[in-house]
Structure formats: structure tokens, C-alpha cells
Amino acid sequence: MNPSEQNHLSVEKPSQTSSGPYTSPPPIGYPTRDAMVGDPPAAAVETKSKGDGFWKGCCAAICCCCVLDACF
């Protein structure tokens, strides 16, 4: 077959009028950037201190890993 006799397919580019890929809406109750009219103001969130027990547990875990590493 002669290369000049081959059928050439033309490919059209998609139109640029689309606004991009479809994205699904966020789940119900998921916070969004836009505040809805009538939404109550966000309450202040109070954080709790993890206390001394948290750090003791972390140190114990690190020591346990070091001992296991030395033994095995």
C-alpha cells in the first residue's frame, strides 16, 4: 500500500466551552468555604492538654523499641 493512499483520520479537539471535569458535592455536614445564610456561628473549640501521661507513654514506647532492637 502506498503511504499516500492511506486513509487519514482527523481528530477534533474537545470544545473549550466546558467548565472542567465534574466534581461531586461534599458530603452533608462537611464544612465549606462559603458560609450559608442562617448558619449559626462556629463555636470556639476547646483543646485539652494531653498531660504528663502522654509523654511518659511515648518515652516508654521508644525505650521498648530500643530494647527490642538490642535484643533481636
From Swiss-Prot:
GO terms for cellular component: cytoplasm; nucleus; plasma membrane. Residues 1-46 are annotated as: Disordered. Induction: Induced by heat in shoots. Repressed in roots in response to drought, oxidation stress and salt. It holds the Pfam family CYSTM. It is a single-pass membrane protein. Heterodimers. Interacts with WIH1/CYSTM13. Belongs to the CYSTM1 family. This is Protein CYSTEINE-RICH TRANSMEMBRANE MODULE 9. It comes from Arabidopsis thaliana (Mouse-ear cress).
